[in-house]
Amino acid sequence: MNKVCFVVVLVLFVALAAYVSPIEGVPTGGCPLSDSLCAKYCKSHKFGKTGRCTGPNKMKCKCLV
């Protein structure tokens, strides 16, 4: 029973992680380390021409056109 619960929780976690878009609320693009890494992330994935780290702790990369 313990292994079954573990597998169910693991499957739910993977499904939730796959459902969340990488540019919505998930720290991406090098934030909070560097705005230049965020800009490079935006350019390489064609989300915009530049980008910067935003949010309370600069944890979210926001791409700008």
UniProtKB/Swiss-Prot annotation:
Keyword Secreted: yes
GO annotations of cellular component type: extracellular region
Tissue distribution of the protein: Expressed by the venom gland.
Localization terms from the record: Secreted
Disulfide bonds: C31-C53, C38-C61, C42-C63
SUPFAM superfamilies cross-referenced by the UniProt entry: Scorpion toxin-like
Function: This recombinant toxin inhibits the mammalian voltage-gated potassium channels Kv1.3/KCNA3 in vitro with an IC(50) of 26.40 nM.
Domain comment in the entry: Has the structural arrangement of an alpha-helix connected to antiparallel beta-sheets by disulfide bonds (CS-alpha/beta).
Name of the protein: Toxin KTx8
